């Protein structure tokens, strides 16, 4: 709004006011909403390949690996998004997903003893976790606090910032210090609405959005670790794992990769991100 001197008006519906991501997408399709910030899970309802960036556990060891894969995949994702009638505005991220539980979780067998919260609208994950021998409990995120208090749920996974912001860690004070996967998303807009905005203002919006993306990404990455420090001051115990324990997580993930490849992530996209990750590691290690 500021960049356009009021020519573009923006009304924001924060914190799930407009419904969950599937509801937001439905509202965009019928024109009730013009734009949205969605996680890669939400974006994958529109372009399934978005899931490849974040839905493969233990794919990345660092932000650099993740950034490389995302940068290489972005042009294709943006093109597919536009073909579906949406314009890509900017990326966003919330940090690295970790497991939080009411007792220490150092290896997968520890997690199998817990009742694990999963998002109610991600039905495909239920079968995946059951295949791994876990006990998934699908719920709305708004029910998680009470579920933890009553032990209906005893473990969940989320980035530290969200665990802190929602105070969920108060009900599960043991964090497994393994970066399971990044939580990321993007802001998109209906193309037919975007096309109504004058080109000069489109350019201003994209420039401002890119600047915000860079600044917020840097800030979020600092706050990801800071959130763990703050929670630790209020009773959280962060459990580091040994190389042997980490190998157990890798082993269980490898058993579920065939399920993820094809069911959660399109096969071609799955293979592509793994290859991109491997290429980055080979080039990085060779220098």
Spell out what each predicted region is.
Residues 1-65, 73-74, 79-287:
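N-terminal secretory/targeting leader peptides
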């Amino acid at each position: 709004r500021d960049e356009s001197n009021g020519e573009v008006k923006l009304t924001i519906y924060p914190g799930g006011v407009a419904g969950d991501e599937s509801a937001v997408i439905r509202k965009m399709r019928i024109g009730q909403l013009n734009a949205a910030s969605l996680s890669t899970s939400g974006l994958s309802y529109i372009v399934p390949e978005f899931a490849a960036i974040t839905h493969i556990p233990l794919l990345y060891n660092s932000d650099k690996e993740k950034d490389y894969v995302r940068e290489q995949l972005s042009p294709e994702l943006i093109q597919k998004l536009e073909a579906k009638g949406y314009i890509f505005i900017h990326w966003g991220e919330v940090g690295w997903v970790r497991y939080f539980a009411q007792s220490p979780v150092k290896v997968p067998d520890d997690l199998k003893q817990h009742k694990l919260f999963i998002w109610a609208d991600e039905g495909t994950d239920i079968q995946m976790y059951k295949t791994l021998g876990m006990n998934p409990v699908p719920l709305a995120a708004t029910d998680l606090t009470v579920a933890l208090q009553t032990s209906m749920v005893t473990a969940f996974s989320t980035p530290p910032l969200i665990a802190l912001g929602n105070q969920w860690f108060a009900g599960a004070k043991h964090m497994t210090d393994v970066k399971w996967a990044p939580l990321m998303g993007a802001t998109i807009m209906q193309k037919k609405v975007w096309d109504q905005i004058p080109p000069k203002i489109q350019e201003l919006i994209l420039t401002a959005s890119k600047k915000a993306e860079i600044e917020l990404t840097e800030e979020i990455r600092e706050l990801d670790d800071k959130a763990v420090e703050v929670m630790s001051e209020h009773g959280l115990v962060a459990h580091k794992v040994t190389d042997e324990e980490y190998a157990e997580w890798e082993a269980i993930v490898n058993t579920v990769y065939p399920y993820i490849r094809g069911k959660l992530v399109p096969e071609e996209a799955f293979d592509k991100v793994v290859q991109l990750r491997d290429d980055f590691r080979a080039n990085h290690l060779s220098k």
